[in-house]
């Protein structure tokens, strides 16, 4: 009996490992700079990029600065060493930090005004064959004014949009697919709620939106087109989530379900979450 329990534990552990392995692993290399900048600038930019990626819950991030990879190996070798499917590299191409403050006439006062502008190149490489999946530049700007303004605060303002950019980045290259498996409720004309076959085991979050796609055929060619959207209301199990059907397209979704059509869902790029 004891041996049976041990065997059962091992099986469940292996299943757990395989489940969590569904998330793609992204190895984030140390960022470089083509120009001389204070270290805090590169550190904060990189941290904002990583935070934005991690908060999507879409991929597993391995931070090169945290795991201390082998310095004798190339970034690609280190990424493969951590079984990462992708290598992400960043390079600061340009930075403009300006102090536009001016002195006032009264009491020799000074109005502080700082501006920050930088261009960062993000490169995503597939480790299996070295293919560059993405090579894109991001330009961000920010400013800080007033008595307590500083260049650091201007940089913080410039980083505000980075999480949103990274969310779109991850959504573009790591989309999630699933299906509607059951109609939960309707009002006779429109679908109100459904179950989808994605849950705790998948890289999803409550509030996340999905496009609902139905397959059609034309001249013996099959294609999919969007008929509506659903939003995750509650993740209820390893492979199930309760979703609210958004009003636009809810009638078409109900008709498709009643006809027995298979409805494919794919994470939406237009609006990922309700916030």
Residue ranges and their predicted role:
Residues 20-60, 139, 144, 173-193, ...:
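A structural "domain/chain start" motif
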Residues 110-119, 126-161, 220-241, 246-252:
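Short secondary-structure boundary motifs at beta->alpha junctions and helix caps
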Residues 1-6:
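Positively charged n-region of N-terminal signal peptides that target proteins for export
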Residues 145-185:
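Anionic-ligand-binding alpha/beta catalytic cores of soluble enzymes and soluble regulatory domains
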Residues 7-16:
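Bacterial N-terminal signal peptides
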Residues 75-125, 235, 271:
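Surface-exposed short loop/turn segments
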Residues 23-91, 131-135, 204-208, 213-220, ...:
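N-terminal segment of the mature soluble domain
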Residues 237-275:
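Glycine- and charge-enriched low-complexity intrinsically disordered segments
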């Amino acid at each position: 009996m004891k041996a049976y329990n041990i065997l059962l534990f091992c099986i469940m552990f292996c299943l757990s490992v395989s489940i969590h392995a569904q998330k793609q692993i992204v190895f984030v290399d140390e960022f470089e700079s083509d120009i001389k900048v204070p270290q805090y600038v590169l550190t904060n930019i990189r941290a904002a990029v990583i935070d934005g990626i991690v908060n999507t819950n879409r991929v597993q991030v391995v931070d090169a600065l945290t795991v201390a990879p082998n310095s004798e190996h190339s970034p690609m070798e280190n990424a493969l060493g951590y079984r990462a499917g992708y290598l992400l590299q960043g390079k600061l191409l340009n930075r403009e930090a300006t102090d536009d403050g001016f002195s006032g006439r009264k009491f020799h006062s000074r109005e502080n005004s700082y501006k920050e502008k930088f261009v960062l190149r993000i490169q995503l490489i597939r480790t299996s064959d070295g293919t560059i999946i993405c090579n894109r530049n991001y330009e961000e700007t920010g400013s800080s004014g007033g008595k307590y303004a500083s260049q650091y605060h201007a940089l913080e303002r410039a980083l505000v949009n980075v999480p949103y950019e990274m969310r779109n980045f991850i959504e573009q290259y790591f989309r999630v697919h699933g299906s509607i498996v059951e109609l939960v409720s309707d009002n006779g004309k429109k679908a109100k709620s459904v179950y989808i076959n994605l849950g705790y085991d998948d890289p999803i979050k409550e509030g996340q939106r999905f496009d609902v796609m139905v397959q059609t055929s034309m001249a013996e060619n099959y294609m999919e087109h969007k008929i509506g959207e659903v939003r995750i209301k509650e993740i209820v199990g390893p492979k199930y989530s309760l979703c609210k059907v958004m009003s636009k397209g809810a009638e078409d979704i109900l008709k498709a379900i009643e006809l027995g059509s298979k409805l494919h869902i794919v994470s939406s790029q237009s609006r990922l979450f309700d916030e």
